[in-house]
A protein has these predicted regions:
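C-terminal motif of bacterial Sec signal peptides marking the signal peptidase cleavage site
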Residues: 16-19
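Bacterial signal peptide processing site
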Residues: 21-23
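Bilobed "Venus flytrap"/periplasmic-binding protein-like clamshell domains
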Residues: 25-53, 59, 119-185, 300, ...
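Pocket-lining segment of extracytoplasmic ligand-binding domains
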Residues: 88-90, 98-100, 126, 130, ...
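A structural signal for short loop-to-beta-strand junctions that line the ligand-binding cleft
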Residues: 102-115, 120-121, 241-250
């Protein structure tokens, strides 16, 4: 039944899109992150969904692996990617020209919507767990994520909030799967693996019997971290989310945002936004974290102006859109 409904939806959109008349490429790239996290499968699945709807127009959308949010900004700027998934932190800093983008504002960056929360997973070998919160990483060999990645930037920002710097840990720069592999081999004490629940690399960590734990974040630590950049909120990883996880884990999350650029065709972005949010069940089949992808919450935590096409879609859905999310190009049309 679900397959028939999906096919019916595809046929409807194929009919609608066949009437669209705009310049288009044959291949559009969606920048994601390393293969062990959530960005990659979500981006690949999104590309498959969009490709199915644009099949008769011979347009393909490909999810591509990358080092993460920071590299994704570069890929967008260089024209090597047309869409990207970014951490809320990186998207905000790039759009505002703040933080690591101080003096380098990306004025053309546009958001499409929040897809799912990026849940912080600080993991540490049980032998080094003392308080059970993220302060336990002090003095340990700890991967902050690949260099020039959103993981590195969010991890360093969180560390700054609890008054830790890279000099307070033995810093490594590894992807998700490599982090767990290095912990298993005894070469690493822990690492930061932010992603939607469940994270495949952490599922592997628990399922393989690795004696490691996900560290919690205290209320005081949340406040201190948000004093640096206000983008995180409380998130509970419910018991049973991972193998052998018997209790809830109190951590934090920030929004994961689908973005593009202001020069992307408005009609195409409108259609892609509509396709994505109206095929939620399909996306859940790709990765369980997509269960939190909803039109009603799609603008939560966004600080980056919406693309005009996405703005039109959410306006049609009756979603209240805050003034700072209105793109400059729509403001100019009103004047």
């Amino acid at each position: 039944m679900k397959g028939k409904l999906f096919l019916f939806t595809v046929l409807i959109f194929t009919f609608v899109l066949s009437g669209c008349n705009f310049e288009k490429k044959e291949i559009y790239n969606i920048a994601t992150a390393t293969t062990g996290g959530t960005y990659y499968p979500i981006g690949v699945g999104m590309g498959q969904l969009w490709t199915e709807h644009y099949r008769e127009q011979n347009i393909k959308f490909n999810g591509q692996a990358s080092a993460g949010s920071v590299e994704n900004i570069d890929l967008l700027k260089n024209g090597e990617a047309d869409f990207a998934i970014l951490q809320g932190l990186i998207s905000t800093q790039a759009a505002e020209g703040s933080g690591i983008y101080e003096g380098d504002q990306y004025e053309e960056l546009r958001s499409v919507g929040m897809i799912w929360p990026n849940v912080e997973h600080f993991v540490l070998m049980e032998d080094f767990v003392e308080s059970g919160d993220i302060s336990d990483i002090a003095g340990r060999s700890f991967s902050v994520g690949p260099q020039a990645s959103g993981t590195e930037q969010s991890t360093v920002t969180m560390m700054e909030g609890i008054e830790l710097g890279k000099s307070d840990i033995r810093t490594e720069y590894l992807g998700y799967d490599d982090t767990i592999s290095a912990m298993r081999d005894g070469r690493l004490n822990g690492g930061s693996l932010p992603a939607g629940v469940p994270v495949s690399a952490i599922t592997d960590m628990y399922a393989s019997g690795l004696n490691a734990a996900i560290l919690e974040v205290t209320d005081e630590q949340i406040d201190d971290i948000n004093d640096i950049v206000h983008t995180w909120y409380r998130y509970t990883i419910e018991a049973g989310s991972y193998p052998r996880q018997e209790e809830d884990i109190d951590t934090i999350a920030q929004p994961n945002i689908l973005v593009t650029t202001s020069d992307m065709d408005e009609e195409m972005v409108y259609n892609l936004t509509k396709i994505l949010f109206e095929n939620r069940e399909y996306m859940i089949g790709i990765h369980n974290s997509a269960r939190e992808m909803q039109v009603e919450t799609a603008l939560e935590g966004l600080n980056t102006p919406l693309h005009a096409g996405a703005y039109r879609y959410f306006e049609e859905q009756g979603i209240e859109i805050e003034a700072h999310l209105k793109p400059e190009e729509l403001r100019e049309e009103e004047n």
